A protein has these predicted regions:
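Active-site His/acidic residue clusters
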Residues: 14-18, 146-164
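Structured beta-strand-rich core segments of catalytic domains in phosphoester-bond hydrolases
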Residues: 58, 64-143
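N-terminal, active-site-proximal structural segment of metallo-dependent hydrolase catalytic domains
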Residues: 1-77, 81, 87-91, 97, ...
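Sec-exported extracytoplasmic/periplasmic mature domains
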Residues: 46-50, 69-79, 107, 174-184, ...
Length: 226
């Protein structure tokens, strides 16, 4: 879930967008506006609970500035009652935005987590990390591997940036291969869930790198115009 510029209201000097999204910045991103956004995000999560009868156990998020904004989201809204935990670290993204994972401790135990930085032409990109979190279900003990992505945008042109998005997808594909090869339950790719903002439509050419590994759950909806 891309939370779209979920910055705090302080100018911490952590990225190109940090000054813009601050109380004195061009966006006039004040504390009241920040906490209003927290409320709107929580309302969307509770809508899922109303729609499906249960709150999501796992939420992958993108475009968060730091751990603090997620802590405020969970403490300043009614989400504080539902035991969500945070997995996050600051990335080297030039805008100062990261990916993170929220999970309900009543449903999962965290086994492990790691980060991978995509490379392009042998050089690490100044982009978001790809986050891998291994969770164990408290109901049955099944292991799941969640991978949170926010691939490079089409800024500068779709064709010009395609190589960077392909490199990020190659990194994701390699991570899936590694996880499947060491699956203790012999499930292979079945316990792997990749999520996030891939900055492309579900029929993008780079998704072919995951053929035979993961199921593209958005492709049919996309073809139907949803």
């Amino acid at each position: 879930w891309n939370l779209e510029n979920f910055f705090d209201y302080h100018d911490n000097g952590t990225g190109e967008s940090d000054t813009e999204f601050s109380s004195d910045g061009s966006r006039r991103w004040t504390s009241s506006r920040f906490y209003e956004k927290c409320q709107m995000i929580s309302k969307s999560i509770f809508w899922i609970g109303d729609r499906y009868g249960v709150l999501p156990d796992v939420i992958g998020v993108a475009e968060v500035e730091n751990r603090w904004v997620l802590e405020r989201l969970l403490s300043s809204t009614l989400l504080r009652k539902y035991g969500y935990k945070i997995v996050h670290r600051n990335s080297q993204d030039r805008r100062g935005i990261d990916v993170a994972l929220l999970y309900r401790s009543a449903s999962f135990d965290m086994v492990d987590y790691s980060y991978c930085v995509p490379e392009y032409n042998g050089v690490r990109m100044n982009t978001r990390d790809i986050l891998h979190v291994k969770l164990k279900s408290k109901s049955g003990g099944k292991i799941y591997d969640f991978i949170v992505n926010h691939h490079p945008s089409k800024f500068g042109g779709a064709n010009e940036s395609e190589g960077r998005r392909m490199a990020a997808m190659e990194t994701l594909s390699s991570m899936c291969d590694s996880l499947a090869s060491v699956s203790v339950s012999s499930d292979g790719y079945k316990g792997i869930i990749a999520m996030g903002d891939f900055n492309d439509t579900p029929d993008g050419i780079q998704f072919s790198l995951l053929d035979g590994k993961l199921c593209n759950t958005c492709l049919d909806m996309f073809k139907e115009g949803e």
